[in-house]
Curated annotation (Swiss-Prot):
Ranges for domain FH1: 432-592
Region annotation (Disordered) ranges: 341-391, 440-541, 1026-1049, 1188-1244, 1260-1380
Coiled coil: 879-930, 956-991
Segments forming domain WH2: 1009-1024
Protein's UniProt name: Inverted formin-2
Compositionally biased intervals (Low complexity): 1328-1339
Compositionally biased intervals (Polar residues): 1206-1244, 1260-1284, 1294-1303
Keyword presence, Protein biosynthesis: no
Biased composition (Basic and acidic residues): 367-385, 1306-1322
Taxonomic classification: Eukaryota, Metazoa, Chordata, Craniata, Vertebrata
Protein family membership: Belongs to the formin homology family.
Disulfide bonds: none
Length: 1380
């Protein structure tokens, strides 16, 4: 114990000296850090910094988040993640660092500002996808989750995710964009990671609303063997995996059904069915020739070729374009159609950076590394000057020089006569970048010469003169042409003049002799080390015309003696063959400067680097000056020769000759001799014993293979003659020859071996054929004698006649046995259920005995692998061999006859028994053919048994599938019940009030987490992606299905929701936004005098709710349409003027007529409490207004389930809303509901005010009738599938009654002023068409709706009751109403 205490004490002291290591304390330093400090800390990647940043991001507000993003915080995170992924995970610390970094990215994307910033800026998702290039499974899991959430978040996010996968495919040089997902799914054994991958697949598919796009994405995964992987994943029996698999299969089934409806019953995912339909479509027309040609061309495409996927993709694009052009190219010819198919609009930037072919090749020195199969454009991306380390001006000059050949045409002046091969004329090498830098260094004194020619150029043009030298300012020369392009033969490269200080290059030759006339000079000799190439030609003869002579070499360059002058009378340059002058750098050494002594012995070599002679010619060099002096020391050559000579090899004395043993004599060739010796060694006995075994007929040491090999090694005729003629010593013969001599001593040795072989073969064959024949015979009997098979076939016959009723295949009396294999091809409407599955379910319920059918076919399944035809052929062939041997034995020696006659007869008897069994099988085959109604001559037992075996396997598999499906259904039901229990527990708080979920979670800053939770639960059976989040999406336009014949909306409903009760102190104004500008165009200034008013909720997940307005006394203070008209005329002043204060009583909840409602219940669904909680506004709401709104939603009332909601004729739509009420009516909470309703409605009737009620409540209906108010036809039509709200908090209040409607707006601004009275209204009628137009316009503008600030959200959450009061269930989301 003392040692342990001492260790603990030392450890404590060490921790105190090292300082506090608690990460919580360190991370706490960033709790109040500003974005600048966080950016600086991010530049030092560490787990502590990332963890602290994660906490800071979770607690940050919108302003802080925006500033952090503007300071490139996200760029730093993604760059660090990319670098961490690129260097691998060699340590646990690296893996933890990666994980904390990706957690910061996820926290950033959890906020509305962060995910919108990523979606609106391309490149971030690509950078995120590069983090998949790591071995850290947890990091890849997080990346796939983020990509999946982006797919569901918005269409833009879905497109960016697909683009990121496409980018990753190009970076990793993969063949398909989804290969990374499928490779991970097929190789991983981590179940949570596999769940993430499968959910990512579902998110990619569900992320698009277009059916064809969904099918295309799903088929891409299916083409990568996803269906096979799903079968393996189901065997893991993980609940989350099963959810994702079920979601995938159900969505696939639904899409296939929808495709079947669209294409008239054609399975567009079945290649054979599509081809058959296409063939039947064009088979009787001339188009069949083109179809055949297209198919023949496609058949020639090799799918294993690397370019095959690109070709197929290009063909797919062309076909899609052809479909689009089908109705638009009637008057065009083939050429015009091809131009329209092939021509595509390209991005201007791509065309600008599309390089010329020659420029492409020249730029190789500054290319970045790309995969080999990438396009030409991608290979010409130049490196950044800062990262490459090359000065920017150097690269610019190099680029200008490299681009010169593309824009200047070379001068073509071909020479006549014979010219030596261009390979004999070397081109002066000069690297591009190095020359550019060298030219920059000397640009002040010498203009840069042209770059050298590229390899492969040919000679046909004299070089142009070099640029003028310093001091030749009066000479004006035109720019020389550029060097020839690669592959453009017939041009001589121009020689660039050497720059000062270029050590390895010879100066150009001096000017020609007087009278030469200035012929072009030859190019300078190449650099040293360019062996194998002849130097340039000598200068031309005097008197040759041409261009002016070149200038002399630069001063200080020295010079070597000029080349020898050419012979006079040589003729013109073009009439003779150019002869190259000798260059010392190519192996022709000049005369040595000093004498070298020759050693007498072979010496060891000194490994040095030899200078070329042309370098030493300079008089200023060390070697030239040293060689000219006489003081050079002389070495002691004799001592050097003794010390550094190679050792001399001493001649060995010839060894005494060894007597070789006498060579063996053999009459066999070497190969046969070797094979026979190998054969004899396996017996491991002397040759005499082997001969005795053969003579006695003992087969114990011989098997079939040995005997077959022995027959091949028997001596041939000439070998037998040679061995018999040998009369010398037998011991001199080889072992194989001696064995042959012993074998020749046995009479009829070959017949003996053949008899041994046939007996072995027959015995083995009969042992194999007897059980096979028995199995085949039993299989035939089992099929005929089975009583379950006919019953099963009768059941299938009845089902088939039912399915094929009315067609040419119906009313059948029987079917061929091969039909049993097609039961699985008929698929049910439900997923993974075929006709065979259903028939087995029927059997399990009503005919359980038929489930034992596979046991009747067990022998048939065994017989399926037997080749019966081979049995016949083997038996007949061996019988023939036995008869032949029997004839040979009858004429052989007596001992052979006595030895093998009995054995041969026994073999024949065994084969005859097998032959009898086969004959019996033939007879049973005829019976089986009659039993199955088949042709006995064409019936193949092998095919029949194979069909029955395949059917038996399908039977057992379908039986197992049914069992597994039932078990999975039980588990799913149990899981569903568990989730429902958890939902029920979470729905209510301590005081029984409803707690918000779903969209509220998104508002609280957990967008990614909410989306992933939705994905994990199976997307809540959603198939289409929602635009943005639930708060940002827009309602869909009203379809024609919900519109009546008279233009009014007619909707059948299933259930109703609770309408929030809001008591207004005064009229409620509608704040104008951009969305209402579009609405006011059709709806502004309308009167509703004696006409029914239709109030249609834009997005109600409840089916419908009704609201009645008295036709005679409906006088509302203002309508939303009037405010829309004012907004259209002057939106700015309208927003400032219009306001209202929403007030409620804290103790009681007032219903429509002002009476208190203690509690109202509704059986099916409830509306959300806060209508405007998810809608952002440019203007901040007042705190009192927020409180009033939260209180106003507590009132609830019961609504019945109406049958059909309709509208009356529109003849009374004038002056329905004329003036505002000036009074407010509030009843106390102690009055009963019935009394409050009767009194309120009676008072409202006497005062000729608008009476509004909600259908379905008997109290409301009776009170309304007693008050002599005509029933209204106002309808509140709910859209059960709508996602979003269009308007927010539009409340229409009368003196005694209140109409509340939620409207989605961007601005919720209210004050204490009342609504102005007696607004003038327009004359435009409001009908369903305008409503449809409004919804469509609102759908377009809905993308612009933004969320409210976090300040408002906090105020809403800090309401009086301390919790949210409404339910925002995924199936009941009420957002607002539109007055029609």
């Amino acid at each position: 114990m003392s040692l342990k205490e001492g260790a603990h004490t030392k450890w404590g002291v060490l921790k105190q000296k090292l300082g506090p290591q608690d990460p919580e304390q360190i991370e706490g330093n960033m709790e109040n850090a500003d974005p600048e400090l966080c950016i600086r800390l991010l530049q030092i990647p560490s787990v502590v910094n990332y963890s602290g940043l994660k906490k800071r991001l979770e607690s940050s507000d919108d302003d802080w988040m925006v500033q952090f993003l503007e300071l490139s915080g996200l760029d730093l995170l993604l760059e660090a993640l990319d670098r961490l992924s690129g260097r691998g995970v060699a340590r646990i610390a690296d893996a933890l660092l990666q994980l904390t970094c990706i957690n910061c990215v996820r926290t950033l994307m959890n906020s509305h500002r962060g995910i919108e910033y990523i979606v609106n800026n391309e490149g971030y998702v690509r950078k995120l996808s590069q983090a998949l290039d790591t071995s850290n499974v947890m990091v890849k899991k997080q990346v796939f989750e983020l990509l999946a959430a982006l797919c569901i978040y918005s269409p833009e996010g879905h497109a960016l995710s697909l683009d990121a996968l496409e980018h990753y495919k190009a970076v990793k040089n993969q063949q398909y964009r989804f290969s990374v997902i499928m490779n991970e799914l097929s190789t991983s054994d981590n179940v949570p990671y596999m769940v993430t991958l499968l959910s990512a697949i579902n998110a990619i598919i569900f992320g698009t609303e277009e059916l064809r796009k969904r099918v295309q994405l799903r088929n891409e995964f299916i083409g990568l063997q996803l269906l096979d992987l799903l079968t393996k994943l189901r065997d893991l029996e993980d609940e989350d995996l099963l959810i994702q698999a079920i979601v995938f299969e159900e969505a696939k089934s639904e899409d296939e059904e929808e495709l079947l409806k669209i294409y008239g019953g054609i399975d567009m995912n079945n290649h054979q069915e599509v081809f058959s339909t296409l063939f039947n479509k064009v088979s009787c027309s001339p188009l069949s020739v083109q179809l055949l040609s297209v198919l023949q061309g496609l058949l020639h495409l090799d799918q294993s070729h690397p370019s095959s996927p690109l070709l197929w993709e290009a063909l797919d694009i062309l076909v899609n374009r052809a479909v689009l052009l089908a109705d638009d190219c009637q008057n065009n010819n083939v050429e015009e159609v091809m131009d329209r198919l092939v021509t595509s609009k390209k991005h201007p930037s791509k065309e600008k950076r599309k390089p010329d072919k020659c420029t492409n090749q020249v730029n190789k020195s500054i290319q970045t590394d790309k995969p080999k199969d990438e396009s030409c454009e991608e290979k010409t991306v130049k490196k950044d000057p800062v990262s490459s380390g090359i000065p920017a001006d150097s690269l610019q000059l190099s680029d200008a020089l490299l681009a010169l050949p593309a824009c200047v045409s070379p001068l073509h002046t071909p020479l006549s006569g014979d010219i030596t091969s261009p390979s004999h004329f070397p081109s002066p090498p000069s690297p591009v970048v190095s020359n550019a830098i060298d030219r920059i260094s000397t640009s002040s004194s010498l203009p840069p010469p042209l770059p050298p020619p590229l390899p492969g150029t040919e000679l046909s043009l004299p070089p142009p003169p070099p640029p003028p030298l310093p001091g030749m300012g009066g000479i004006s020369l035109t720019p020389p042409p550029p060097p020839p392009l690669p592959g453009m033969g017939g041009m001589l490269p121009p020689p660039p003049p050497p720059l000062p200080g270029m050590g390895g290059m010879l100066p150009p030759p001096p000017p020609p002799l007087p009278g030469m006339g200035g012929m072009l000079p030859p190019p300078p000799p190449p650099l040293p080390g360019m062996g194998g190439m002849l130097p340039p030609p000598p200068p031309p003869l005097p008197g040759m015309g041409g261009m002016p002579p070149p200038p002399p070499p630069l001063p200080g360059m020295g010079g070597m003696p000029p080349p020898p002058p050419p012979m006079f009378g040589m003729g013109t340059f073009t009439d003779e063959v150019v002869v190259a002058r000798v260059d010392y750098s190519l192996g022709y050494l000049p005369k040595a400067y000093f004498k070298v002594n020759k050693p007498t012995l072979k010496m060891k070599k000194l490994n040095w680097q030899k200078l070329p002679p042309n370098v030493i010619n300079d008089t200023h060099s060390m070697w030239a000056s040293a060689s000219s002096s006489n003081d050079t020391p002389e070495p002691n050559y004799s001592s050097i020769e003794q010390l550094f000579c190679l050792p001399q090899a001493v001649a060995k004395e010839p060894a005494a000759p060894v007597k070789k043993p006498p060579k063996e004599i053999s009459f066999l060739d070497s190969k046969k001799n070797l094979n026979l010796n190998i054969f004899l060694k396996q017996f491991k006995c002397p040759n005499e014993e082997v001969i005795q075994l053969i003579e006695k007929g003992d087969r114990s040491r011989f098997d079939i293979e040995i005997l077959k090999q022995f027959l091949k090694l028997l001596p041939e005729k000439h070998e037998v003659e040679n061995l018999k003629s040998y009369q010398e010593d037998k011991a001199k013969l080889s072992n194989a020859d001696q064995f042959y001599l012993l074998l020749l001593g046995i009479p009829c040795y070959q017949l003996r071996i053949e008899c041994m072989l046939i007996c072995e073969e027959v015995n083995l064959m009969t042992d194999v054929l007897r059980p096979k024949a028995k199995v085949v015979s039993s299989a035939c009997d089992d099929i005929i004698s089975s009583h379950r098979l006919p019953l099963f076939c009768q059941l299938i016959l009845k089902v088939g006649n039912f399915l094929n009723y009315g067609s040419h295949t119906g009313n059948a009396n029987g079917f061929k046995i091969g039909t049993l294999l097609k039961l699985t091809e008929t698929k049910a409407n439900q997923n993974r259920i075929t006709l065979l599955h259903h028939i087995l379910e029927e059997i399990e319920q009503n005919h359980t005995d038929l489930l034992q059918l596979p046991s009747d076919l067990e022998n048939v399944s065994t017989a399926a692998g037997i080749n019966i035809e081979n049995m016949y052929s083997e038996t007949s062939g061996n019988l023939k061999k036995l008869r032949d041997l029997q004839n040979k034995i009858s004429t052989a020696a007596t001992d052979v006859k006595d030895q093998y006659e009995k054995s041969i007869q026994e073999c024949m008897d065994a084969l005859k028994e097998v032959e009898e069994q086969l004959t019996d099988i033939t007879q049973k085959k005829v019976k089986l053919a009659d039993y199955l109604c088949e042709d006995s001559a064409k019936l193949s037992l092998e095919e029949t048994f194979s069909t029955m075996k395949a059917f038996r396997d399908l039977f057992l598999k379908a039986k197992k599938d049914n069992k597994d499906r039932k078990e999975q259904a039980v588990k799913a039901e149990k899981r569903k019940k568990q989730l429902a229990d958890e939902e029920a527990k979470r729905q209510k708080g301590e005081n029984g009030k409803i707690i918000r979920k779903g969209a509220a979670k998104l508002e609280e800053g957990c967008i990614i987490d909410a989306l992933l939770a939705d994905i994990k639960k199976g997307f809540q059976l959603r198939k289409t992606a929602k635009t943005k989040t639930e708060a940002d999406s827009c309602p869909k336009p009203v379809s024609s299905e919900t519109t009546g014949t008279d233009g009014t909306d007619v909707k059948h409903v299933d259930h109703v929701g609770i309408l929030p009760q809001i008591k207004l102190d005064s009229s409620l104004n509608l704040d104008g936004t951009e969305q209402h500008k579009s609405k006011s165009k059709d709806n502004c200034g309308e009167n509703f005098d004696n006409k029914p008013v239709v109030i249609a909720p834009i997005n109600l997940d409840t089916s419908a709710c009704l609201m009645n307005i008295s036709e005679q006394n409906a006088k509302l203070p203002v309508s939303a349409l009037q405010e829309g008209a004012n907004l259209k005329q002057n939106p700015d002043t309208f927003v400032k003027e219009q306001s209202a204060i929403v007030t409620t009583e804290s103790s009681t909840h007032n219903n429509i007529d002002g009476s208190s409602v203690d509690k109202c219940t509704l059986g099916q669904s409830q509306w959300p409490s806060e209508i405007s909680d998810e809608v952002d506004s440019k203007y901040h709401e007042m705190p009192m207004q927020v409180e009033h709104k939260e209180r106003a939603v507590e009132g609830k009332c019961s609504l019945p389930k109406p049958s059909v909601l309709g509208t009356e004729s529109s003849s009374n739509q004038n002056n329905a809303l004329n003036e505002g009420s000036q009074q407010h009516h509030n009843n106390t909470a102690n009055e009963s509901l019935q009394q409050a309703q009767n009194s309120a409605l009676s008072e409202a009737s006497q005062q000729s005010c608008c009476h509004t009620g909600i259908k379905g409540s008997p109290q409301f209906q009776s009170s309304a009738l007693n008050a002599d108010s005509q029933p209204s036809h106002t309808s509140v039509v709910g859209s059960a599938q709508a996602q979003r709200n269009e308007l927010d908090d539009v409340a229409l209040q009368t003196r005694d009654t209140t109409v509340t409607e939620g409207s989605q707006v961007e601005e919720d601004k209210c004050n204490d002023e009342g609504y102005p009275e007696h607004k003038t209204m327009g004359e435009h009628p409001l009908n369903s068409s305008s409503h449809s137009t409004t919804l469509q316009q609102s759908s377009e503008d809905g993308q612009k709706v933004k969320r409210g600030s976090s300040k408002h959200k906090k105020k809403r959450r800090s309401s009086k009751h301390g919790e949210e009061d409404g339910v925002d269930s995924p199936t009941h989301k009420t957002r607002g109403c539109v007055v029609q």
